[in-house]
């Protein structure tokens, strides 16, 4: 999803299609070290956007914790090492807001990293993403001066939009709710069940806004990026700047879809962290702002869902 949005943004900036190299998971398994090394040796890219990841909601993280930590660690390590071995000087790693402690002060600043206990429901994924940040920082520290390595990290909040995964069990909250309300609408269901209490607050960012943020951070002069980060805390948050309750999200999506069923909250299911809202002032001060508001973004996401039925 994010990779496709980055491609759209680069094309809109005037980058030639022939200068953009992409691979689907079917074409290149990033957990296969030899295959990744071969790809970099053949293609010789000059910049890398590392957007690939195994992602999912609370259910998927609970059921497949080993997959989430192993696959993400392997993908990150293989790509970053292969990039270095093949002379790539500029790389941007995309992480996640779940890197921050469960009870971090809100909004979460970049310096909250590693200051407390992680949210248990997605700890393996979070640890993998923290490792990705530290991989970038470690390569910069060891090879920055000698090889010109400049590997950066950006931490998106919860993303949604075209190209999302709408699987009924393994998707994130917005695509899961879009599917659930759409199916309830078709079935004229009197009610729709939502996991948890509906009270947790979350921040959401439209994927094309994230693509713009990613390209913006990648293109910053090194001196500017270094001025706003430190060698041991080099990541930058990317969020919309506001958060909403899950109940509000459900109500807005129901209205977008046109589902009249009663929303019922299953309080026997986990909520996850009580609040996740990121402080994106560092990125805002560097010249980026989110553009797409939730209601507009949900409408675009629902249109994308309908287009893939």
What are these regions (language model features)?
Residues 3-4:
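N-terminal Rossmann-fold NAD(P) dinucleotide-binding loop
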Residues 7-9, 13-14, 183-309:
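C-terminal substrate-binding subdomain of Rossmann-fold SDR/epimerase-dehydratase oxidoreductases
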Residues 11-38:
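Adenosine-cofactor binding site in Rossmann-like domains, unifying the SAM/SAH pocket
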Residues 23, 48-54, 91-97, 154-156:
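SDR active-site strand-loop-helix element
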Residues 33-73, 85:
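NAD(P)H-binding glycine-rich loop region in Rossmannoid oxidoreductase-like domains
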Residues 77-122, 152:
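Conserved Rossmann-fold NAD(P)-dependent oxidoreductase catalytic core, especially the SDR/UDP-sugar
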Residues 103-112, 137-222, 241, 251-255:
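NAD(P)-dependent short-chain dehydrogenase/reductase
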Residues 124, 128-131:
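Active-site helix of classical SDR
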């Amino acid at each position: 999803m994010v990779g496709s949005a980055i491609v759209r943004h680069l094309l809109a900036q005037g980058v030639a299609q022939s200068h953009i190299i992409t691979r689907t998971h079917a074409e290149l398994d990033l957990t296969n070290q030899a295959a990744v090394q071969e790809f970099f040796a053949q293609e010789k890219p000059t910049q890398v956007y590392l957007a690939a990841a195994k992602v999912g909601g609370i259910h998927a993280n609970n059921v497949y914790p080993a997959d989430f930590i192993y696959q993400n660690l392997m993908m990150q390590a293989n790509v970053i090492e292969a990039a270095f071995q093949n002379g790539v000087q500029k790389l941007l790693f995309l992480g996640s807001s779940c890197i921050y402690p469960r009870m971090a002060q809100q909004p979460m600043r970049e310096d909250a990293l590693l200051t407390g206990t992680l949210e248990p429901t997605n700890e393996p994924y979070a640890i993998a993403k923290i490792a990705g940040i530290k991989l970038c920082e470690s390569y910069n520290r060891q090879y920055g001066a000698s090889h010109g390595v400049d590997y950066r990290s950006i931490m998106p909040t919860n993303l949604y939009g075209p190209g999302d995964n709408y699987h009924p069990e393994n998707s994130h909250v917005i695509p899961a709710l879009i599917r659930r309300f759409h199916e309830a609408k078709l079935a004229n269901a009197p009610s729709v069940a939502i996991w948890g209490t509906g009270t947790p607050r979350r921040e959401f960012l439209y994927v094309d806004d994230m693509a713009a943020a990613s390209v913006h951070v990648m293109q910053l002069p090194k001196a500017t990026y270094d001025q706003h980060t430190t060698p041991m805390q080099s990541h930058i948050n990317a969020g919309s700047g506001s958060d909403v309750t899950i109940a509000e999200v459900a109500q807005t999506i129901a209205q977008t879809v046109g589902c009249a069923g009663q929303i019922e909250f299953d309080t026997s299911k986990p909520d996850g962290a009580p609040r996740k809202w990121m402080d994106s002032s560092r990125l805002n001060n560097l010249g980026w702002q989110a553009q797409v508001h939730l209601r507009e973004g949900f409408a675009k996401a629902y249109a994308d869902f309908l287009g893939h039925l």
